[in-house]
Amino acid sequence: MSSGIILLIVAIVLLVIIAYLVGVIIRKRNDSLITSLEERKQALFALPVNDEIEEVKSLHLIGQSQTSFREWNQKWVDLTVNSFADIENHIFEAENLNDTFNFIRAKHEINSVESQLNLVEEDIASIREALNILKEQEEKNSARVTHALDLYEKLQASISENEDNFGSTMPEIDKQMKNIETEFSQFVALNSSGDPVEASEVLDRAEEHTIALGQITEQIPAIVAKLEDDFPDQLDDLETGYRRLLEENYHFPEKNIEARFQEIRESIRANSSELVTLDLDRAREENTHIQERIDSLYEVFEREIAAYKVAAKNSKMLPRYLAHVKHNNEQLKDEIARLSRKYILSETESLTVKAFEKDIKEIEDSTLAVAEQFGLQEKPFSELQVTFERSIKTLTNVESGQMDVFAAVKDIEKIESQARHNLDVYVTQLHMIKRYMEKRHLPGIPQDFLSAFFTTSSQLEALMDELSRGRINIEAVSRLSEVATVAIANLEDLTYQVVQNATLTEQLLQYSNRYRSFEAGVQSSFEHALRLFEVENDYQASFDEISYALETVEPGVTDRFVNSYEKTREHIRF
């Protein structure tokens, strides 16, 4: 053979070997793909879809939910019966084609199987999701129904246990319960007939009505208890107490108490009858009005009971107090009469005592007999309390006024005695002041002193005249005595001032001799001051003139003389 042929043969052999090797590699790769597809198929087939279907089926779906479930269940059946079988056939065909090295057709079958598995996988996911939605929805609906039924059953049990607490409302409550029961039956019928929307609305209404009725039944017993127990008990208590108070001679300003009892009982009956409408707000409001009317009756009785205690106490005190005040007034009248024989008294005291007597007489005429016959009175104790308290207040004011009048007249004799004593003292002081001035040997007496002296003397004479009368005007005596006291004190001060000015002026005039010869101002003031001193007897002006002149030449000299005089000044010996 030629070398060319040999090379050709070798090349062909190499090509065959290479082709074989390539075929083996492709076959193994396809086997791997086919195995992977088989595993995917088995994994999909092994999903717990059947279990999930059985779980949803056990929920006993109805209506639209049941229809939807059947559709998804049928889709699963189609997948298991048709799709999986078709995939199995295509996998088997791909294996045969791959084993016979028909790689192109094998690849086509592999691609076809892969596409089918993708579709099946999506369908299974949709089926499982739909089943889960159906399950959740059914569980939710079931929970709603269960919750609503539980509410209804609890309400029914509560009403049965407390039937006696609902009074006249029981027929209406039974009617409402039957209406709710009818709504539940309507819900079941609509749900079974495949109308879930309407069924849901009916269930909502049933639940709302159950809750509303439950809230109403919680409030009714308290209202009924008021109408059937509390109010009747309170009325019985009031009527019993009213009869007992009447037996104990109580009387009341209100004359319609029996009628008010009857009106309240009628209101209780009317409210009980109206309560069947379950208008609880109106019933509570009416209960409040009834309680207010009952409370007002309690207040009437409690007022009279409290008034009795006060009036009974005051009825015992009033006669004694009246006698005491009357006795005081008689004593006061006697004292004023005694004093009036010697003294001219203010008309105020007499008029006041007469006013006291009038007040006492009015109480004696209008209230004393009522107090003394307290147990036989046919008036409300509250009125008697007001009457007694008003009378006691009047007597208190009278007694206080009596004390004021007594305080005003009790010291009249002391006032006279003190005035006489003061007069004697003041007359003596007036004489001593006169002698004190005479002993000073002054050039003359200043006019202001003379005016004060004679005015004081006149005031003492006026007081003496008043005390000499047959009936002394004690007010005038008191006034004149006060005026005399002030006048004698002022005269004493003026006396000391006149004597001091005169003495100091004499001393300063003598002292000024030191400066007169060489101080023209001092000489001039000396002459002026001397004229004021000896001629005009104006000792104050004379002192001011000479002291001013000396201060200009010897500051402080005046104070030195004044201080020295005050230490040695002679006092009036009273």
From Swiss-Prot:
GO CC aspect terms: plasma membrane; septin ring
Membrane-crossing segments per the record: 8-26
GO biological process, one term: division septum assembly
Record keywords, A-Z: Cell cycle, Cell division, Cell membrane, Coiled coil, Membrane, Septation, Transmembrane, Transmembrane helix
Cytoplasmic side: 27-574
Record-linked InterPro entries: EzrA
Main location, first listed in the record: membrane
Recorded topology in the membrane: Single-pass membrane protein
Cell compartments where the protein resides: Cell membrane
Coiled-coil annotated residue ranges, if any: 102-141, 274-350, 459-520
Extracellular-side positions: 1-7
Pfam families linked to this entry: EzrA
Its job: Negative regulator of FtsZ ring formation; modulates the frequency and position of FtsZ ring formation. Inhibits FtsZ ring formation at polar sites. Interacts either with FtsZ or with one of its binding partners to promote depolymerization.
NCBIfam families according to UniProt: PRK04778.1-1, PRK04778.1-4
Family the entry assigns: Belongs to the EzrA family.
HAMAP family (alphabetical): EzrA (MF_00728)
The protein, known as: Septation ring formation regulator EzrA
